[in-house]
Regions:
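Glycan-recognition and catalytic cores of secretory/periplasmic carbohydrate-active enzymes
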Residues: 1-306
């Protein structure tokens, strides 16, 4: 792959991250007609006049935690980063952290986000984002093992994992929150990231409680398998309440993370193998459009997300 530089950019969520966009989403989820109309307007501007609307809104190009982490992963995979440059990328990644203190190291969106599950501030760390930074830290450490800063920061993500709220615990099953905050609903794909994170610590963190890391990863996997539908799909939320859905985006995350966990922990489980196979079949049969070589976004939906 041809090398390219990581530079500030416009993001698809720029407009929704503004105070106006946040208020529209709040009203949308409350069912306000005015907010629904405004949401259509924002989406239309994003589709037809993306650059013009950003100039009008005075949106600045920026970097986000997930893009920096993903770039590092790709750059390491393609040998774009030298030993000397690894320190610079480590510093850049650290600048994106939501929490960086003596007890925890974690990452979020980098901007305020309004969802059905609550309002998350720009400094709220997410379990769906932090694992990418964890993997990036491990990659940077592999480039320069003598630099212990990256592995020390990786080890500190344990504090973030342990700060997540237990949403379900019983019968060898465990489910955690999306962020270290009170949330009304359990997000299934988020728990696949939590299980992956504990698996990464089990393999790479020599200071953590290995038994805790292994058991939590395994119990979360058990919970994910338990919540898989008979047709192989996973709902976004682990409930039957309004606003739930199945989309290709998050379905792929669940399957991808389960495959990684199976490899990391060398799990020989017929139930896990079956869950992965059924999940892949669901994605192919319900999302993939063979005639155009693309996938559709939803297979099950309640309301359209703004």
């Amino acid at each position: 792959m041809k090398k390219f530089d990581l530079i500030p950019y416009y993001d698809p969520y720029d407009l929704w991250a503004t105070s106006f966009g946040q208020n529209v989403r709040k009203g949308f989820y409350k069912g306000h007609l005015k907010s629904k109309i405004m949401a259509v307007g924002i989406a239309s501007c994003e589709l037809f006049i993306p650059n013009l609307i950003r100039k009008f809104a005075r949106t600045k190009k920026s970097l986000h935690p997930i893009s920096v982490a993903q770039y590092i992963l790709m750059a390491c995979e393609n040998s774009w980063i030298s030993i000397g440059e690894s320190l610079d990328y480590l510093a850049l990644l650290r600048e994106q952290a939501a929490i960086d203190d003596g007890e925890s190291f974690s990452f979020g969106l980098g901007f305020t986000w309004v969802s059905k599950n609550g309002i998350y501030t720009s400094q709220e760390p997410f379990i769906t984002h932090t694992p990418y930074a964890m993997e990036a830290l491990l990659k940077l450490n592999s480039i320069d093992p003598s630099n212990l800063d990256s592995i020390k920061l990786f080890n500190k993500t344990w504090g973030f994992l342990e700060s997540l709220i237990v949403m379900f615990n019983g019968n060898d099953k465990l489910a955690l929150s999306y962020a270290p905050a009170d949330e009304p609903r359990i997000v299934i794909n988020a728990n696949s990231y939590a299980a992956l994170s504990y698996a990464l610590h089990f393999i790479n963190n020599h200071d953590c409680d290995k038994e805790v890391a292994y058991l939590k990863a395994l119990n979360i996997v058990n919970w994910i398998i338990y919540n898989q539908r008979l047709d192989g799909g996973w709902m976004y939320y682990a409930d039957n309440l309004p606003g739930n859905f199945i989309d290709c985006f998050h379905s792929c995350f669940v399957v991808k993370n389960l495959i990684k966990i199976r490899a990391l922990l060398s799990l020989e489980s017929s139930e896990l193998n079956e869950a992965i196979d059924n999940g892949i079949d669901y994605i192919i049969n319900n999302f993939y459009q063979k005639d155009v070589g693309l996938v559709k976004r939803f297979s099950v939906r309640d309301i359209k997300d703004p």
